[in-house]
């Protein structure tokens, strides 16, 4: 059966939604739901390099205000005597006050790379800065779990394409933007007919395999997303819709332990405060609805929401009322099951810089190792090759 270029692109488009659906996901229809009190990780990626110094503000540091005469945050919400949080993240302040938020400062890695693409690859793969890996840290987690577990663990990304973080050597997560749209597309007669009439020896056989996997599983994911309708109101932003999708799946009996979302762009070279405030407002309201939803369903104790960005920004503002690519940054951890709460370590040292950039003190791979071992109950040394200890915030 020959296909035209237009038809090939249609198949490719649907295949991209799953980005090579892993074989283990086919069996998930027959798996039991997550065990009671099973921990769930939700990753929220701040794409573009969020400015950490205008997120957690060193509110009593003269250097900060001197280097950022026009963009320094003057009305931060106090967390400690020395640190405040951006007022657009007012709900994060509420979580902090309730002991449901932790923040780790100065997170990075040796020899940092200021390229968006390369630094994101490093964060996704948990590689060294001079090491190039084709698998992601959560993808290798799937490889490890699916090898030793009777019921394989599933991961889902709410996006059109699958991130490197979720690609393993043998197993990959499943990426989709909207369960209903994916299901409706998979049910089109054209795709079903095409799949029914393909031949194994065709040069595009891999696309047909992916197409079949997507058709078989799109209905299952859509069914689970509709299983327990939420009464919680969510903002109409894209991130609000994405969190609503995640919440609906968590409340169903789908066997999913990792969810991955992203928001951006935080690449604020020009007029930073206006752009960052808009993004933070979207994040603030979406997270507020999601946490309320999880709490009302008795699930918040077992949910860990982790945020990260590929790098921070330079200490000094630029001439365009923005900031340029930097290095170390902070990470947020939100959960009803935190063991250590609040500001976990010292604020950035603005007197000790590396050519105008912050110097990292906490390796992001140690954060990953902590989450893998203490939250997901995985062998972090096998997944990461990390043997330099873990933290105790979860």
Predicted regions and their residues:
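N-terminal secretory signal peptides
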Residues: 1-3
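Beta-strand elements within well-structured catalytic alpha/beta cores of enzymes
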Residues: 39-50, 92, 102, 257-263, ...
């Amino acid at each position: 059966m020959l296909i035209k270029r237009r038809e090939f692109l249609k198949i490719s488009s649907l295949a991209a939604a799953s980005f090579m659906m892993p074989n283990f996901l086919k069996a998930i229809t027959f798996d039991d739901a997550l065990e009671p009190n099973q921990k769930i990780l939700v990753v929220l990626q701040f794409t573009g390099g969020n400015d950490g110094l205008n997120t957690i503000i060193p509110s009593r540091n003269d250097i900060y205000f001197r280097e950022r005469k026009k963009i320094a945050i003057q009305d931060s919400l106090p967390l400690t005597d020395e640190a405040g949080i951006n007022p657009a993240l007012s709900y994060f302040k509420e979580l902090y006050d309730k002991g449901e938020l932790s923040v780790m400062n100065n997170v990075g890695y040796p020899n940092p790379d200021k390229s968006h693409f390369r630094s994101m690859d490093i964060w996704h793969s948990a590689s060294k800065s001079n090491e190039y890996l084709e698998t992601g840290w959560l993808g290798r987690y799937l490889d490890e779990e699916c090898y030793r577990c009777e019921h394989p663990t599933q991961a889902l990304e709410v996006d059109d394409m699958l991130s490197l973080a979720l690609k393993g050597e043998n197993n990959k997560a499943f990426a989709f933007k909207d369960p209903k749209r994916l299901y409706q597309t998979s049910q089109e007669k054209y795709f079903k007919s095409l799949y029914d009439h393909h031949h194994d020896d065709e040069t595009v056989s891999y696309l047909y395999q992916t197409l079949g996997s997507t058709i078989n599983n799109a209905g299952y994911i859509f069914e689970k997303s509709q299983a327990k309708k939420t009464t919680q109101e969510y903002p109409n932003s894209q991130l609000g819709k994405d969190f609503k999708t995640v919440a609906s799946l968590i409340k169903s009996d789908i066997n999913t332990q990792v969810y991955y979302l992203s928001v951006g762009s935080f690449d604020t070279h020009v007029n930073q405060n206006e752009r960052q405030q808009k993004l933070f407002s979207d994040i603030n309201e979406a997270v507020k609805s999601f946490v309320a939803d999880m709490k009302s369903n008795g699930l918040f104790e077992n949910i860990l929401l982790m945020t990260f960005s590929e790098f921070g920004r330079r200490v000094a503002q630029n001439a365009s009322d923005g900031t340029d690519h930097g290095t170390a940054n902070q990470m947020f951890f939100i959960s009803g099951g935190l063991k250590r709460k609040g500001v976990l370590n010292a604020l950035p040292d603005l007197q000790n810089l590396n050519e105008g950039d912050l110097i990292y003190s906490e390796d992001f791979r140690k954060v990953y190792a902590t989450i893998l071992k203490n939250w997901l109950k995985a062998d972090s040394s096998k997944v990461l090759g990390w043997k330099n200890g873990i933290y105790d915030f979860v």
